[in-house]
Amino acid sequence: MSTANAKVDFDAIGIGAGFAGLALIHYLREAGRAVRVFDRASDIGGTWTWNRYPGAATDSESYYYCLTFSKELLQEWSWTKRYPGREETQNYMRFVADKCDMWPHIQLNTEIVDAQFLDDEGHWRVTTGTGETFTCKYFISGMGMISEPVIPKIKGMDRFKGPLFHSSRWPQEGLDYAGKRIGIIGAGATTVQMVPVLAKTAASVTVFQRTPNYILPAMQKEMTPEWEKEIKDNYDAIVAKCRNHVFGMAFDSPVGRNAVDTPPEERQRIFEENWTGSFRWVFETFDDLLANPEANRMASEFIIAKMKERVNDPEIGNLLAPRFEDYPLFAKRPPLDHGYLEAYNEDHVTLVDIKDREPLVEITETGLRTTLNEYEFDIIVLATGFKAYTGALEAFPIRGSSGQTLREKWQTVSESIMGVCVADFPNMFTITGPQAPFANLPTSIEQNVIWITRCIEKMEREGKDLFKPRRDAEQAWTAQTADIHAQTLMANGDKVNSWMMGANREDKGARVLIYFGGASVYYDALDQSAANGFPELEFETR
């Protein structure tokens, strides 16, 4: 497809060939735009290309962790499990690209190292790692909210003689860890997924934990023909549920009852009956678990008791389980458990408390030293999380009309308009950027891309050359996001270094990164913005 804008190579350039890149290709191509999506990886898949660690799987249930623009694709693709692994999820994306003939619009093995808005020309120029340049009218980030890893500053990291890497950079050629001694720094969702798999063949697995997590059961199960038929017969309703749910998921909530108003025995019965896996337990039991501190305490104590039941050693159980007094449920994102807690019942799986008992001192040639002990390892994995929401956008210079980079603009406050555009960055969109909701990502991605496409269609229809995000609109959205955040229990996240507030980063302080007013409310705001002609933006013709 030729570009409608003769002065540029493409109407739109997107960065990132995961769900966002695929959605971008579909919707912009339908709108008649010439689009090219670049990715530094050798295959499509986004986070599922990079996170190759053993046990990597989705935490959203498969049948709504997908794009919904085609009813045919929803019917033709068959998931095999409740929570698909990395390979199956990536295969799904390849299926979408194949069926929709998206490959001609994707350029792999191409890292973008610079993006700059050229004010005189009124368009963007992107530069690749080989020095090649491309121009576009619209520059769009689909790089994802958890794609840039946090690498902790630990003394001696360059001294270790064995493999040492971040979990999201697990060797693509594979790694033989059978019979090896493995040390894992970090105890979040990645570690919860890795440990049960590694423990099957490793000589030993030692986890160095700073903050314990509220851990919910995954309760993985195979997709049966009967279950698949039920899903495919009801996909319209499933898509509608995701669009209207507070976290973009196909859950039956709200349920019309509150924990604080329910008698103790009845409350316990409801908690027990719904202990069937996934985040459903949080949303399909009571409506006040994330809003009312007392209800949250009840839920937290139930989870803590359930966790301790599965660990034979009470001392280890106490280390693994958080305390409500330290932080409430969902101040940190709870991982889903595929056998993590039970792994500590094995003699060769060890937990080390590095917050209160034996802090890390340094990495040595042969392992790791704490204030109390020395540990020898063959492999060290940094499961230390990501620079959420802003990290990928700050990883290389993205320079707007003021000459300022995004990294410079966001040094103290990460501001945006609905997570999709940023003042002083004309004709640039960010898919699920900072101050977008924390929700089922494919749902949020599609809602963002629909808004972006409608904006571009308006500009092309009306002959507009530029949109400029209004500074007052950015300030208003940032203030609204901060006000809502302050009223939630998630505001406690800075106390436990939650990545949802960027508190896990050493280069920046905690900040409000997520809109917690509800995904459905946010999607409504996007629709209202488009229906009203995008009042958050100023349009220009040159």
Give the role of each language-model region.
Residues 178-180, 322-323:
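Short, surface-exposed connector motifs at secondary-structure boundaries
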Residues 197:
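Active-site-proximal cofactor/substrate-binding loop regions of enzyme domains
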Residues 179-181, 354-355:
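Short, basic, glycine/proline-bearing loop/turn elements
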Residues 175, 182-185:
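A conserved hydrophobic secondary-structure block that centers on an alpha-helix together
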Residues 2-12, 17-157, 173, 187, ...:
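N-terminal FAD-binding dinucleotide-binding subdomain shared by FAD-dependent oxidases/monooxygenases
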Residues 170:
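Short, acidic/glycine-rich phosphate-metal binding loop used to engage nucleotide
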